[in-house]
């Protein structure tokens, strides 16, 4: 009987170990405790703006010549982008009118787009620079929020919403909740996961082990929305603190031991672990 109980206890312990392993994943020097959700990045334009045609064509050329692949390796260590490729995409467009192109970017979405001192950087920023160089356009930047992308586009403040942007046509609904198809969107070009991350050398391996601790997240509404979607998890923490600087600031604080966990982007995790 004692032997049977001992075997049962051993099996239970093994089951718990496998359960813990299933709910967390070690990536480099970090551990992903839980994935809170996934999203897809897109580029948005005013509906009918010819800029969308030129930018899409330039992106196809940059995918064909390896520029996008090189940028993906630089920022993420791997290329999971899904841009269409066509080396001749610009040939059929004839002469391209010269212009200043204003990029509306989210400066809280490292490493897609972020403020680095007085300049902007990131995968999307460098890709936009490559696009404008190919088109002969002058590129300017304007910080916007993901939530206000449609307003910024329709008002003419920006020519595109590009830089860690998660967009769909519901973002252009009017006050009566009726769709107003006033945005032209590219196909999704990169998937991102919102993840609950701890240091790999910490004692935290499950959401349960984080009870009463402090979790940091960026000021963009995306992060709080992902955390709040799991009400039980949100209440689990002693404090949920927002910090400016997005995932970059969160990873720096986590590495410095200023918090137990962070809510951050899988693209940022890829940046810090490749």
Range-by-range predicted roles:
Residues 19-22:
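C-terminal motif of bacterial Sec signal peptides marking the signal peptidase cleavage site
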Residues 105-111, 117-133, 165-166, 191-251, ...:
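Bilobed "Venus flytrap"/periplasmic-binding protein-like clamshell domains
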Residues 157, 214, 258:
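Conserved functional loop/turn residues at catalytic and ligand-binding sites
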Residues 35-81, 125-134, 200-222, 268-270:
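Extended ligand-binding regions for polar small-molecule ligands
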Residues 40, 78, 174-176, 241:
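A residue-level marker of the well-folded mature domains of exported/periplasmic proteins
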Residues 51-78, 88-89, 94-169, 240-243, ...:
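Extracytoplasmic small-molecule ligand-binding "clamshell" domains
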Residues 1-10:
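Bacterial N-terminal signal peptides that target proteins for export
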Residues 27-37, 45, 94, 125, ...:
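Acidic, polar ligand-binding/catalytic clefts
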């Amino acid at each position: 009987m004692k032997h049977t109980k001992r075997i049962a206890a051993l099996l239970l312990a093994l089951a718990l170990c496998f359960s813990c392993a299933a709910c967390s994943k070690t990536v480099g020097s970090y551990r992903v405790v839980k994935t809170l959700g996934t999203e897809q990045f897109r580029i948005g334009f005013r509906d009918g703006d010819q800029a969308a045609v030129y930018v899409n064509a330039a992106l196809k050329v940059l995918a064909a010549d390896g520029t996008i692949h090189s940028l993906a390796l630089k920022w993420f260590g791997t290329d999971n982008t899904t841009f269409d490729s066509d080396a001749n995409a610009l040939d059929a467009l004839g002469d391209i009118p010269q212009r200043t192109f204003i990029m509306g970017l989210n400066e809280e979405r490292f490493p897609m787009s972020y403020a680095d001192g007085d300049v902007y950087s990131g995968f999307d920023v460098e890709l936009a620079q490559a696009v404008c160089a190919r088109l002969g356009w002058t590129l300017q930047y304007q910080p916007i929020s993901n939530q206000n992308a449609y307003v910024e586009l329709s008002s003419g403040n920006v020519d595109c919403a590009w830089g860690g942007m998660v967009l769909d046509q519901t973002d252009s609904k009017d006050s009566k909740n009726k769709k107003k198809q006033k945005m032209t969107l590219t196909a999704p070009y990169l998937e991102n996961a919102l993840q609950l991350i701890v240091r790999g050398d910490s004692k935290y391996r499950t959401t349960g082990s984080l009870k009463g601790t402090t979790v940091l997240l960026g000021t963009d509404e995306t992060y709080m929305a992902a955390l709040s979607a799991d009400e039980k998890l949100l209440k689990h923490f002693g404090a949920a603190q927002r910090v400016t600087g997005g995932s970059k600031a969160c990873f720096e604080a986590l590495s410095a031991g200023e918090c137990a966990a962070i809510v951050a982007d899988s693209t940022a995790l890829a940046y810090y672990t490749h």
